[in-house]
Amino acid sequence: PDSGFFANSALNLEYRQGPELPTLKYGFPDSHFICFPYETRRTGIYSAGCVKRPMETAKVLDDAAGAAMKAIQCSELTAEGKAVHPRAGDMTYPEFNMNRCTQCKRCTEECPFGAINEDEKANPLPNPTRCRRCGICMGACPERIISFKNYSVSMIGNMIKSVNVPEEDEEKPRVICLICENDALPALDMAGIKRMKWSPYVRFVPMRCLGSMNLVWIADSLSRGIDGILLMGCRHGDDYQCHFMKGSELANTRLSKVSETLDRLALESDRVKFVEVGITDYDKIPQIVDDFMKTIDEVGPNPYKGW
């Protein structure tokens, strides 16, 4: 959460979330310092030197040069209509079908980068130059009006629908794993390279960020007879590793509301599980998958299988 350290405005940014850089702890700007050491939650603004953390003069000079290079890179990519890190070069952007918008403000409130403002009627006003193409707004929208040309609710939904669901008499479970492409998917790749083994009944569906998860995917999967949904996302919390700052945390928050869907379908809550996976946790992937498969074996097949 924002520490709220800055009492006086210095930057006077015109963002819905306020005029300053969001801070995390001790008044320093919020950022994913492991992978993007100069990044802030304001696209095109990079922190350096003692603005970022305490450091000596020599280090400040090197740090300032690094931040300047990132600013040049951002200017060049933005001029070409491309996204900056972590999806550098992506030329897609969120498109809104305003005919179905209910002005719920969830997209404007949940975007970690302030890429969506509001007009006087609470309609979303996207700013593509601020957008990181994470898809968090897409996952937040209950009406599913937000999409990208190469990434949408219907596109992932069709991927899930194409997964073969074994018949009940085959006695083979089917589990879908929604996996973040930033940390969890590379960890899965490394586990595969090292020839590690896990259950063959799991099908992995990569996502830009787990924060782009829309709850309709879980409802549709379970109603089709999928036995379980496993979600693998970045670590969140005070020492978060989410490349899009809040995506993994938001996915976990949304998942806490999925119990209503499970109750409506008369299904067990154990059929849906969220797991935090770091990029170095490749050796834990087989155990994570196999433990979840044991849980699915205990609760039994989905009663909607074969309908």
Predicted segments with their positions:
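A short acidic (Asp/Glu
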Residues: 188-190, 241-243, 285-287
